[in-house]
Amino acid sequence: RFAGRVQIKAGFEPRPNIQHVVFDFDGTLSLVREGWPEVMVPMFEELLPEAEGDTSESVRQMLLDDIMTLNGKQTIYQMIRFAERVADRGGTPEDPLEYKHEYLRRLEKRINSRVAGLQRGEVSPNQYLLHGSLDLLNALKSRGMQLYLASGTDEVYVKREAKLLGVAEYFGKHIHGALDNYKNFSKRQVIDRILKKNQVSGEQLLIFGDGYVEIEDCKNVGGLAVAVASDEANNGSGEFDEWKRNRLLGVGADIVIPDYRDAELLLNVIEGK
């Protein structure tokens, strides 16, 4: 029996042949960037031209919806969307890449002490790993599965933080993140490459993610999608983030979990054991 919460889609069918497992990073394994919307939304509020009928609540809601709908894609897409909002309101938007760099500068300030604490060994990586992450990674490795990391966060940061959290070794050279030349990377490209290179079908693919993009990409190729509706601010609470849960079920997630406290059991269910 599951000790924690789990939601399994009606009509779920086990996949005994899974060989390749793709993880999103932030919110799925890493909590180093927890709270990033509290950096992005205020920045957008500050830079957005006013329009008639605006209330601070309506603007915030609009921006949050834009941001969360694109969660899982490279950060640049949230900036492109914001630039469109600025233009719609008669403003002259900056280049989205400028917005991205300014956002990353602000976010770096917010997470600076977390990164420094990890670098100096003052903080246990467990504090910034979603509850049960290592149990899950070890359980997958012991089954001989090939693991990949594909993140919408810039690749340099993904590599830095995966290393600091002690999870880089599970993925080896298969750590992929956003590039300034954003057309050269997407989660879908990573998935397509895995299937093509290994000559396998989506039947053999398992994806863990907390953004709608990777769940949708996974279902589009016939993979099994585990949505991680993690409550990032309360790691280990075992509670769902309801917004994520509803959103990810809406794009076809097969299983929804809040964290990995039931890692071994979860994999047995997935494999039909």
Kindly label every feature range from the protein language model.
Residues 97-98, 168-184:
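A short, structured active-site edge motif that brings together acidic residues
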Residues 134-142, 195-196, 215-226:
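Surface-exposed amphipathic alpha-helices with a cationic face
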Residues 142-145, 198-203, 270:
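Glycine-rich phosphate-binding loop signature in dinucleotide/nucleotide-binding domains
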Residues 4-61:
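Active-site neighborhood of HAD-like aspartate-dependent phosphohydrolases
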Residues 185-218:
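Conserved Lys-Pro-Asp/Glu-containing loop-to-beta segment of HAD-superfamily phosphomonoesterases
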Residues 151, 207-258:
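Acidic, Mg2+-coordinating phosphoryl-transfer loop and its flanking beta/alpha structural elements
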Residues 40, 122-128, 133-163, 175-182:
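Substrate-recognition element of Asp-dependent hydrolases with the DxDx(T/V) motif
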Residues 65-126, 131-142:
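A metal-dependent, Asp-based hydrolase signature
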